[in-house]
């Protein structure tokens, strides 16, 4: 499967630079996303495209307010394209956009006593599952989504205590 990850950051601080650099090393981020898509049995004859933006609490709050009518920062916002006409425009299939607040990831890692890395990959996995159609509004759907998150994270060696 060919995957195009449009990865960017609008962070104005160097605080997370080392972590961001590790995402680029050996295509680590792209390989992680590919494996998640493979675990979810996503196939395509055309390249798949995914946009990922790393930001801070202030910027994600603006997006959350504008698109979800929630005036508060959040960890991740996903925009799925599979239900729109924009899904297969051009030479690839667009999965969607994922926006992650690294500040919120750091806060949650501390709150849940996880490593920053584990919390980042949890939030990223959560965002990927949303663009693949998973949701957690209904209790049954929430249970299924949590099971998939834990199974995916476990396949990478990320457990609740790591």
UniProtKB/Swiss-Prot annotation:
Biological processes, Gene Ontology terms: rRNA processing
Family: Belongs to the endoribonuclease YbeY family.
Gene Ontology MF annotations: metalloendopeptidase activity; RNA endonuclease activity; zinc ion binding
Binding site for Zn(2+): 126, 130, 136
Official protein name in the record: Endoribonuclease YbeY
Domain of life where this protein originates: Bacteria
SUPFAM superfamilies recorded: Metalloproteases ('zincins'), catalytic domain
Cofactor: Zn(2+)
GO cellular component, one term: cytoplasm
Compartment list: Cytoplasm
Alphabetical list of Gene3D superfamilies matching this protein: Metalloproteases ('zincins'), catalytic domain
Job description of the protein: Single strand-specific metallo-endoribonuclease involved in late-stage 70S ribosome quality control and in maturation of the 3' terminus of the 16S rRNA.
Cross-referenced Pfam families: YbeY
InterPro entries from the UniProt entry: MetalPrtase_cat_dom_sf_prd, YbeY, YbeY_CS
EC number of this enzyme: 3.1.-.-
Top enzyme class: hydrolase
